[in-house]
Structures are given as structure tokens and as C-alpha cells.
Amino acid sequence: MVVAHPTATATTTPTATVTATVVMTTATMDLRDWLFLCYGLIAFLTEVIDSTTCPSVCRCDNGFIYCNDRGLTSIPADIPDDATTLYLQNNQINNAGIPQDLKTKVNVQVIYLYENDLDEFPINLPRSLRELHLQDNNVRTIARDSLARIPLLEKLHLDDNSVSTVSIEEDAFADSKQLKLLFLSRNHLSSIPSGLPHTLEELRLDDNRISTIPLHAFKGLNSLRRLVLDGNLLANQRIADDTFSRLQNLTELSLVRNSLAAPPLNLPSAHLQKLYLQDNAISHIPYNTLAKMRELERLDLSNNNLTTLPRGLFDDLGNLAQLLLRNNPWFCGCNLMWLRDWVKARAAVVNVRGLMCQGPEKVRGMAIKDITSEMDECFETGPQGGVANAAAKTTASNHASATTPQGSLFTLKAKRPGLRLPDSNIDYPMATGDGAKTLAIHVKALTADSIRITWKATLPASSFRLSWLRLGHSPAVGSITETLVQGDKTEYLLTALEPKSTYIICMVTMETSNAYVADETPVCAKAETADSYGPTTTLNQEQNAGPMASLPLAGIIGGAVALVFLFLVLGAICWYVHQAGELLTRERAYNRGSRKKDDYMESGTKKDNSILEIRGPGLQMLPINPYRAKEEYVVHTIFPSNGSSLCKATHTIGYGTTRGYRDGGIPDIDYSYT
């Protein structure tokens, strides 16, 4: 048994060794796995913590980072990676305050940077950006490179900046393939920006300086649905004829606060739903302006100069729900009888506001829908008259209504029915026909550069079209100038004319209050301005006005010089008198006598409270208290005993019961104290 034991030991030792090795290997592999898992978990947690870290000056909420109204001069550098919307408005951030690592935030889609200190379009923006607000900054330029860095941009707000037409780089929007909304309100634009993206659906250019719109201004904008041009300098003559007709998908057009005399020609009719024309100078509307606008729901013509509307203007407006006509001088005559009937018939579906009569006098202040008996007089029967004649005149007027010239800036043609370009060799008689009987004009040259025009209309009119042309130089092509004159005016003064020149002046009635003018032939007259050196010039009139006007210029200058010299002499005399008086005063001060200064001091002390002022070698006493002293003071010196001191007490003048006491308790016998 002793021999077998070692054998057993030798046999079992290799097995134990193998088992221990396997156990150690397994333990080692498990430890490595655990270490790897722990490292990965730590890295993941670190990434999560970094992505959710919020800047200390901001507030974060599920991807929305609120850093607005903090007075920041730069964007915080530790913006979380999961941020989707950055609110950075109402700060003082400039272009240098936009960090470069902002473009690495690939989840950011909306940035609000309005009301900051940006003077250039920011470039360090994430490519994922879809909406950018830059209102109320000082951005001056729009470069193609800046927009190319954010190709996914859909909405760009640049209101209230300093962008001008020349500061927009050519093809600046060439890489903005997804831009749908562009706001450029309240900038310095003088024309429509070129190269706008074809994907644009909403364009706002209100409150700029746009005065002209050429034919190609909106070329290719087939997706445009909303166009706002309020508060510009637009007039009919500076808008090309087919400017808006190409915008077939337009649903809203706003031309508020411009200088339109009539609605623009060829408005888009297929899908237009809202048309805003208020706050212009519109005095007439052609009968076919709103033709085929079957989708129109809202029409605003408030704050214009309309007195009447042509029959059938609203015939195609089957979906019209709101019609605003406030603040117009409506003349509720027979020509508006059709409108009264239309308002009553559509009262259930159309909300009409502001159709208040301003004339005739008997219906002033009444709503047109409430007028019955006055308009029923238009139906008086008679042979070939009554309703038939009134209807015939009204119908004829619809087709003969004047159209404000539009597009003449680009076509260089004057569209004036019945008015040819004047020729200096042709005489211009007064117009004939029914239209000529309603208007008579008289012209008179006042000065070398002005002509006065007066006229008389037999029927009240909403407006007159006045045109004039200088003759004698180029009969075939003349520079015709025209303007619209309100119907209540009876005279007009032409100024800034050429001296000794012949002018042909024509006037036509746009619309009368009771019936339209069937014949639009203008009434014309000639006038010749005076010679610039003739007796009718303003200068000669002023010279002949009175005797003072004939004084030579040298006499006027001499009189002015004499007047100035007189003032100088008087000033010298006043100065001399002043100096002499001061010397006399000083002499008297020297010769006052030999009284001593102590006398002045003593008398001043005894009589009243005074101050001493030293002037020259003597003393002068100036009283400052006009009241008499209430009691005289006698000064006594009190010698206190050894070891005692004087106590101080307040003394009031006029109260004799107040006494002072020494430390020994013995009262003083005097009423004054030291």
C-alpha cells in the first residue's frame, strides 16, 4: 500500500493540472469580455451625455434649444447634437459669433436669428437647414455661395434688412431647388429680383421702392400662389400688359398702397381667390377686369376714388363671399341701379361692406340697398325713353369705359382711343357728337412756362383724363403727358413748360355720374406760351408791380450798407456812455471823504445786520436784512473762576426770558452772551 500511493499521486497530478489550466483560461476570457462591454457602455453613456448637454445660458427641451433674449454676442459652442430648432432671436449676435462647428449639427432644421447684429448672410449653417429667420438685421447682400451651402432651404425670411436690387448676386437662387417661401419686405429693392427659383410658392416684396414691373419679371414662376406688392411705387403706366397673366396658379394678389388709377390689365383669372386693391387712386374699373374670375372669394376696393361701377362687373364672380367698398365717393344715380339689385339678390351669400352713397345730396349717407323711391324714378316710362334709354346708355357705357394706359413704358405706344399723335399743321376743332356736349374747355397762357386750363362739364363726372403735347419739333413722335383729374375739379395749371411753344391740350370725360359717355373723342384746344423775355413773364410782372420793384440792385445794397453803418455808430455811442458812467462812479468813490473804516463797521453793527464789501480803496455797506434790529446788544466779558467753564445756550432774539448760567449756578445779569 505504501508503494501504490505515489503511483496514484503521479497519476492524478496531470489531470489536476489540465483542469486548473482550463479554469484559469475560462476566467481570463470572461474578464476580457466584461472589460470590453464596460468600455463600450462607458463610451455609449458618454456620447449620450454629450448629445444631451445643454448650454448653461440656454434651456433645452426635446430638441428645442431656447437661447433667445439672453444678450448673447455669439452662439454657444456646446449645442447638443440632437438639436432640431434653435431660438437665437433678440440677441446681439454678429457674423463672427457664429461658430464653424454649427454646420456639423446635422439635425438642425429651423434657426431663428432675427433681431441680431448680422450684416452679412451667415455661412456656417448646417446643410440640413430648411427654415431660416433673419428679419430685423442689417444683411446687405445675398450671394450664391451662401445659399448653396444650405440646398435644402424651403423658407427664407429676410424682412427688414438692407438688401437692394444690385446687392443680390446674379443667379443667387440657382442652387435653391427647394425654396418655396421668400420674404423680402421692407428692404431697398427698386425692381423685382431676377432669377427667382421656379419652386417659389409665396413671394413678399411689400414696402420697397419698386416702381416698374417688366414683362419677364415673373417668368417661370408657375408655382407661385401668393404675391404681395403692397406699399411700392407702382403705377399703371409702369406695369407691362401681361405681367400677371402668366401667373396662372396665383390664388392671392395684393397691390395695396400703390399709385394705381385702375386695376392692372390681364389679371390671372383661373385660380385667383383673393384680390386686394385698397388704398390706391382707382377712379374707374373697366367692365371686363374681373371676367372669368370664378374662384374669387374676397375683393377689397376700399379707400379709392370710385364713384360708380360698370354694369356686369361681378357677373362671373360666382364664389364671391366678401366685397369691401369702404371710403369711396359713390354717386348713387341711375347708373348704380344694377348694383343695388345685385346686392339685394346676393345678400344671402355675399357680405358687402362700405357701399354708402355720397351723392346726390338727397341720398347722402344712405346705404345703396336701402334706396328705393329715388332709384325707381329711373323707370319712368315714355316714348322710346324711360327704361329703354337708360339701359341703352348704361350698356353702351360698359363697352366704352376708358382704360388707363398700362405698359406704355415698355411698348412706347399711347393707347388712347380717338386721339392721334398731333401734327403742327393740323387744326384741332372741338369734338362733335354726344360726348362733346358734356364738356367744354378753355386754355390761357399765364407765363412763359405755365398754362391755365378751365373746363365746364354738363354732367357730374368721376374723373377727367387730361393730356398735353408740345408741337413744332417732331409731329410724328411727340412726348405726350397725361394725368387724371378728379371729377370735382374745374381748373388745372400746367407748369414747367417751354417758353414760346405751342401746346395741344386735350381732355376727355372718363365716366359721368348718370350715364357713360358713348363718344370718347377728346375735347382739344391749342395754347402758346409767352416769350421768356416778354411782358407776360413772371419777372416782368414783378418788376411792373410797383415803384419799389424798379429800384436798382446797387441802391438796395447801398441802403443795406448804410443801415449796418448806422447800427455800428449807435453801438459805439452806447459803449462810450457806458464807459464814461463807470469812470464817474469811480471818481465819486475816491472823493467820499476821510471817514475811517471803523466808522462803517461800527455803524453797521449798531444799526442792522450788514455785510461789508470792499470796492476800490473804500468800504461800502450793503444791507441784506431790511428789518430793524429788535434790541441792542452790549458785549460784556465774563471771567470764569478757576476750574469752571462756560455753558452754551441758544439765544433767540425777541425772547427776554432766556438767561445764561455759569457752572456755579449764578445767573448772568445780561441778556447777551459771548
Curated annotation (Swiss-Prot):
Which GO molecular function annotations are given, in alphabetical order? Answer: fibroblast growth factor receptor binding; protein-macromolecule adaptor activity
Note whether Nucleotide-binding occurs among the keywords: no
* A Pfam family of this chain: LRR_8
Q: LRR repeat ranges?
A: 82-103, 107-127, 128-149, 152-173, 178-199, 200-220, 223-246, 249-269, 271-292, 295-316
> What does the UniProt keyword field contain?
Cell adhesion, Cell junction, Cell membrane, Cell projection, Cytoplasm, Cytoplasmic vesicle, Developmental protein, Disulfide bond, Endoplasmic reticulum, Glycoprotein, Leucine-rich repeat, Membrane, Phosphoprotein, Repeat, Secreted, Signal, Transmembrane, Transmembrane helix
For the Fibronectin type-III domain, which residue ranges apply? 437-532
Segments on the Extracellular side according to the record's topology features = 49-552
Listed transmembrane segments: 553-573
How does the record classify its membrane topology? Single-pass membrane protein
Q: What is its main location?
A: membrane
Give ranges for the Cytoplasmic compartment: 574-674
- The secretion signal range is 1-48
Stretches assigned to the LRRNT domain: 49-81
Q: Which SMART domains match?
A: LRR_BAC, LRR_TYP, LRRCT, LRRNT
Subcellular location as annotated = Cell membrane; Endoplasmic reticulum membrane; Cytoplasmic vesicle membrane; Cytoplasm, Perinuclear region
Q: What subunit structure does UniProt give? A: Interacts with FGFR1. Interacts (via extracellular domain) with ADGRL1/LPHN1 and ADGRL3 (via olfactomedin-like domain).
Record's function text: Plays a role in fibroblast growth factor-mediated signaling cascades that lead to the activation of MAP kinases. Promotes neurite outgrowth via FGFR1-mediated activation of downstream MAP kinases. Promotes an increase both in neurite number and in neurite length. May play a role in cell-cell adhesion and cell guidance via its interaction with ADGRL1/LPHN1 and ADGRL3.
In its UniProt entry, what is this protein called? Leucine-rich repeat transmembrane protein FLRT1
Q: From which organism does this entry originate?
A: Homo sapiens
